A protein has these predicted regions:
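C-terminal catalytic/substrate-binding lobe primarily of soluble NAD(P)-dependent oxidoreductases
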Residues: 68-171
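Adenosine-phosphate binding glycine-rich loop
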Residues: 45-84
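A short helix->loop->beta-strand "cap" motif at the edges of active sites that frequently abuts
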Residues: 17-20, 44-46
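Glycine- and other small-residue-rich loops at beta-strand/loop junctions that grip anionic moieties
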Residues: 3, 26, 51-55, 131
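N-terminal glycine-rich "phosphate-gripper" loop used for MgATP/nucleotide binding
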Residues: 1-12, 24-32
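Rossmann-fold NAD(P)-binding glycine/threonine-rich loop
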Residues: 25-48
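Generic structural signal for hydrophobic
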Residues: 13-14, 41
């Protein structure tokens, strides 16, 4: 399913018909619903792959690779910059208005999205950007990949205007 969220309703229909599903959704609520469907699909032996894009997706592959390359890893922090089109921009906008989740010492923490400014460095030409918590499924999916992690966070670059207008409808 390579379209804007939500994917869960269509995925449930496909699973009921025995059709495998691969989702690129990066919407937190949608991914949580897809994970519920995935658990039911396993009983029917229908594959459901959640988080098959860049973020989430490629990040999970990198974490899996790194956990095999090092003796131990305690923390993973993901930072994202930029958008790739109108749907992506809308998701970026909406994700700053919701609730952010993070994994901390074996517990799920919920914090307001758009809070917790942290300076993150990206490769040139992007450079340093202020990044904030956002409603991302990354911590949920990464915790499933590497349950031994103690801390998992996800942040997105945003301007003051992004944060100020996040709770308003996107035009």
């Amino acid at each position: 399913l390579a379209h804007g969220a939500p994917h869960s309703a269509l995925a449930a229909t496909f699973v009921a018909q025995g059709i495998a599903v691969v989702s690129v959704s990066d919407n937190l609520a949608d991914v949580l619903a897809l994970l519920d469907i995935q658990d039911r699909a396993l009983a029917r032996k229908v594959p459901v792959i959640v988080g098959a894009a860049c973020s989430p997706g490629m990040t999970g592959l990198l974490v899996h690779h790194v956990t095999r390359a090092f003796d131990s890893i305690d923390e993973v922090h993901v930072a994202v910059h930029g958008t790739g089109g109108p749907q992506c921009a809308r998701q970026h906008h909406d994700s700053l208005a919701g609730v952010s989740i993070g994994w901390h010492e074996g517990e799920w923490l919920q914090r307001p999205a758009g809070s917790g400014r942290e300076l993150c460095w990206f490769p040139d030409p992007v450079g340093a950007r202020d990044c904030y918590r956002f409603a991302s499924p990354e911590p949920v999916l990464l915790q499933r990949i590497a349950p031994s992690l103690q801390r998992i966070t996800a942040r997105v670059s945003a301007t003051r205007r992004d944060r100020l207008t996040a709770r308003l409808p996107m035009l």
